[in-house]
């Protein structure tokens, strides 16, 4: 038993925590998720600590690497997120570049045709250079968007001035 679990069980947790689980073993992620849920179903916990879903790395193969992914990687990813949607799980996906986010959104749109994802609060994390078209697709799906302060720290050099202009304002004080 970890110390944070004891703090929660003893009623001493002072902040609300919703946590996600990620696949730890390349190629065995789906088995891991199924085993997790067999032990700890969606909604585990209470108002202070509860299991929320899967992410930020759903599969190693789809974890925000550049370029196009093989179809087999996309098929495996689809099966996992479809399974998650069918169980009402939140999904958070780490994704860095707008240049190939079409792959991810295409899969999520496919899942959404069978299981609406809007009420599940799915999120793309770290998509620091989302284009207006990408943001519209995300809005249409009801997908959330989280960014890092990477754009505040040399964003124009990391991406380009146009990407930096699309970022929401960062409040620093």
Regions found by a protein language model. Name each.
Residues 5-102, 106, 110, 137-150:
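Metal-coordinating catalytic core of metallo-dependent amide/deamination hydrolases
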Residues 64-73, 123, 159-171:
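Glycine-rich tight-turn/loop motif centered on a GG-T
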Residues 129-173:
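Active-site-adjacent C-terminal substructures of enzyme catalytic domains
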Residues 1-3:
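Short, small-residue-biased leader/transition segments that mark boundaries at the very start
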Residues 111-116:
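Alpha-helix termini
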